[in-house]
């Protein structure tokens, strides 16, 4: 082998030049590859996400994008939105569509793009809003259905009272079975003179909570006994004849609706529809002074104290849509009837944060219902717990709650202006403090004053915020009216309500 001199080797001038050239070449190649990795490469959206279908109510679906260092998303229509406009690598993205009130199917596209990769198109389709087709449907009939929006109607309603613990009373057996009738909790059957007394005292509205599940003729089909419907209708007619607006609902009924999760949704929707179809048909011919309210305080009995999930809210909002669809599908005056839908657990804060307005085939004929029972330890905490007996500035420093005082009432009820300002009227379907009649002497005297101060303040704040307050009268010792004679039983509390109205 020929011996190579040191001057001809790696460290010779020529060798050094060669090394530098190779380093430059390698660096250029590395940069080129890096840029290729950043700007191009694979962009993937699984086929299962390429075609998204939504119902008319609007909702959200989640897709997964697996891309290079940077990718972009755009949507073709304003009603279809993406949670991201830009991202990198593998990420989940929410595609949300608004409710479709256009009365026709609509489509949009979502485009996912990245430099150096072909665009991926996701097709979005949303169905039109429609109601069920019932054989019992009749053409819309506006006889007795004034040309009033629900907001305009709410201004005529002013204030009302519940005839509680009566038609919604049920006895729950150890096996979960339901029985009983309107008298099983100790109140008499409502009569004509009761409703006349309510009207004479200055009230405009009566809410009649009703249960039906304990009166099924056929539990498999949810067929309600005609005799029970007759009783409810007799009370409704008596209240209307007295000149009152009347609200009927499906109340607690043992809590069968209180499992709002997707796994139960189909069965619960089916039962709710079957029951409301019968109720709507029975009361279809009444004028617009009769309002239907879909449910009551729907929550999740299986939550064990945990906060509601997005699934809970969505399914409960869906109950409202089933109710509206079912009533409208019966036609006649129900086509125009004013309907009342509920926030989750009828809670004000949850209404503001999570309520979704149901779609409707008529405009501006829906109320929202919330209840107000703050502070809990003053209003409805059981008598055998550490309740508070006093309320308000007059008793500051006394046996009052830390929350739920005047400022809190103002803040909570005024938050409902988000609906009022958008022409969605709000009914406070229940409010009122428990009467702690086990107290005596000065303690009872201060408690009674606190109750009436509270009642007046809630009503006054409702009026200020254009809300319709309905006092919860459960009968018994705290009732406003004698259920048999219709005469005032608690004149001071009635006076507090009327003072709050003025």
From Swiss-Prot:
Record lipid sites (S-diacylglycerol cysteine): 33
Main localization of the protein described in the UniProt heading: membrane
Enzyme class: hydrolase
Covalent lipidation (N-palmitoyl cysteine), chain numbering: 33
Domain of life per record: Bacteria
Localization per Swiss-Prot or TrEMBL: Cell outer membrane
Keyword Hydrolase: yes
Annotated keywords: Carbohydrate metabolism, Cell outer membrane, Glycosidase, Hydrolase, Lipoprotein, Membrane, Palmitate, Polysaccharide degradation, Signal
Effect on the protein of changing residue 33 to A: Abolishes surface localization and hampers growth on xyloglucans
pH dependence: Optimum pH is 6.0-7.0.
Catalytic activity: xyloglucan + H2O = xyloglucan oligosaccharides
Active-site residue numbers: 297, 430
Pathway(s) this gene product operates in, as recorded in its UniProt entry: Glucan metabolism; xyloglucan degradation
Span of the signal peptide: 1-32
GO molecular function ontology, one term from the record: xyloglucan-specific endo-beta-1,4-glucanase activity
Record-level GO cellular component terms: cell outer membrane; cell surface; extracellular region
Transmembrane segments: none
Annotated function: Catalyzes endohydrolysis of 1,4-beta-D-glucosidic linkages in xyloglucan with retention of the beta-configuration of the glycosyl residues in xyloglucan degradation. Cleaves the backbone of the 3 major types of natural xyloglucans (seed galactoxyloglucan from tamarind kernel, dicot fucogalactoxyloglucan from lettuce leaves, and solanaceous arabinogalactoxyloglucan from tomato fruit), to produce xyloglucan oligosaccharides.
Family statement drawn from the similarity comment of this UniProt entry: Belongs to the glycosyl hydrolase 5 (cellulase A) family.
Identification of the protein by name: Xyloglucan-specific endo-beta-1,4-glucanase BoGH5A
Organism: Bacteroides ovatus (strain ATCC 8483 / DSM 1896 / JCM 5824 / BCRC 10623 / CCUG 4943 / NCTC 11153)
């Amino acid at each position: 082998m020929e011996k190579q001199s040191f001057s001809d080797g790696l460290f010779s001038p020529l060798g050094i030049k060669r090394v530098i050239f190779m380093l430059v070449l390698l660096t250029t190649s590395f940069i080129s590859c890096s840029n290729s990795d950043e700007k191009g490469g694979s962009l993937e959206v699984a086929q299962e996400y390429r075609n998204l279908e939504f119902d008319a109510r609007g909702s959200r679906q989640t897709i997964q994008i697996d891309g290079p260092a940077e990718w972009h998303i755009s949507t073709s229509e304003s009603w279809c939105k993406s949670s991201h406009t830009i991202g990198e690598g593998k990420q989940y993205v929410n595609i949300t569509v608004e409710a479709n009130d256009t009365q026709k199917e609509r489509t949009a596209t979502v485009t996912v793009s990245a430099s150096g990769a072909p665009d991926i198109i996701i097709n979005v389709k949303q169905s039109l809003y429609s109601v069920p087709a019932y054989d019992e449907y009749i053409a819309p009939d506006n006889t007795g259905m004034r040309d009033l929006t629900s907001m305009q109607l709410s201004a005529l309603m002013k204030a009302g009272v519940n005839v509680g613990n009566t038609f919604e009373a049920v006895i729950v057996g150890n096996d979960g079975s339901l029985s009983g009738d309107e008298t099983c909790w100790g109140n008499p059957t409502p009569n004509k003179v009761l409703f006349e007394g309510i009207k004479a005292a200055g009230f405009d509205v009566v809410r009649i909570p009703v249960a039906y599940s304990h009166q099924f003729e056929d539990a498999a089909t949810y067929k309600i006994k005609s005799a029970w419907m007759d009783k409810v209708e007799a009370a409704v007619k008596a209240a209307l004849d007295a000149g009152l607006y009347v609200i009927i609902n499906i109340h607690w009924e043992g809590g069968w609706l209180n499992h709002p999760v997707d796994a139960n949704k189909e069965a619960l929707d089916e039962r709710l529809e079957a029951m409301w179809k019968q109720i709507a048909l029975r009361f279809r011919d009444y004028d617009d002074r009769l309002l239907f309210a879909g449910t009551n305080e729907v929550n999740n009995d299986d939550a064990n104290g945990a906060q509601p999930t997005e699934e809970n809210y969505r399914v409960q909002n869906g109950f409202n849509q089933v109710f509206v669809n079912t009533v409208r599908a019966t036609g006649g005056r129900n086509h125009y009837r004013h309907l009342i839908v509920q926030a989750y657990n009828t809670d004000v804060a949850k209404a503001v944060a999570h309520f979704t307005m149901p779609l409707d085939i008529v405009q501006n004929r829906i109320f929202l219902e919330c209840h107000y029972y703050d502070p809990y330890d003053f209003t409805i905490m059981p008598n055998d717990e550490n309740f508070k007996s006093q309320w308000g500035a007059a008793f500051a420093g006394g046996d009052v709650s830390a929350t739920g005082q005047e400022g809190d009432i103002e803040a909570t009820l005024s938050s409902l202006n988000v609906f009022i300002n958008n022409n969605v009227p709000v009914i406070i379907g229940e409010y009122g403090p428990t009467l702690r009649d086990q107290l005596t002497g000065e303690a009872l005297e201060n408690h009674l004053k606190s109750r009436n101060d509270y009642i007046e303040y809630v009503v006054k704040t409702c009026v200020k915020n254009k809300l319709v307050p309905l006092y919860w009268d459960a009968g018994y010792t705290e009732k406003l009216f004698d259920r048999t004679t219709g005469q005032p039983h608690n004149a001071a509390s009635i006076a507090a309500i009327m003072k709050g109205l003025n």
